[in-house]
Regions:
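Terminal amphipathic alpha-helical/low-complexity segments used for targeting or macromolecular assembly
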Residues: 1-62
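Left-handed beta-helix
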Residues: 66-67, 72-73, 78-87, 92-93, ...
């Protein structure tokens, strides 16, 4: 199984097994969305299967993250969205985003978010470089 999917699963539930994967796909809209996004990024036949599912979820769901967006290991979407992340955004490892988050740009490339960042509810990031660590990690 894809290391990215397993790291997202571990970030959400603290476990990496088949039953937890099934639970995440059924119960957690954020993890379910990320599962299909990660499958789109794999390529091959899996991408052909996952692309229409991802497109449907992106169009009719509460989460809008393009499969071309670069997202590191251990990504977590709190409360199942809603959130919007531009295709050109880059998000580091072990990042959390909460509900009503928008990461994009009015022109050009979107923001680059560093590792171990928590983005709280209703935040809109429109800048190019946002390599700030979460406030709780700044110690």
């Amino acid at each position: 199984m894809n290391e990215y999917i397993m790291s997202d699963l571990y970030r959400c539930y603290g476990k990496k097994n088949f039953m937890t994967l099934c639970r995440g796909l059924i119960e957690d809209p954020g993890f379910n969305y990320m599962f299909w996004l990660r499958m789109c990024q794999r390529g091959g036949i899996l991408k052909l299967i996952a692309l229409p599912i991802h497109k449907w979820k992106r169009t009719f769901g509460k989460i809008n993250i393009g499969y071309k967006c670069q997202i590191g290991y251990g990504f977590y979407i709190g409360h199942g969205g809603p959130c919007v992340v531009s295709d050109s955004a880059v998000i580091g490892n072990n990042c959390n985003i909460s509900q009503f988050v928008t990461i994009g740009s009015n022109e050009g490339k979107s923001a680059t978010i560093g590792n171990n960042v928590y983005i709280g509810p209703s935040v809109c990031i429109n800048w190019r470089q946002c390599n700030y660590r979460s406030w709780c990690d700044s110690g």
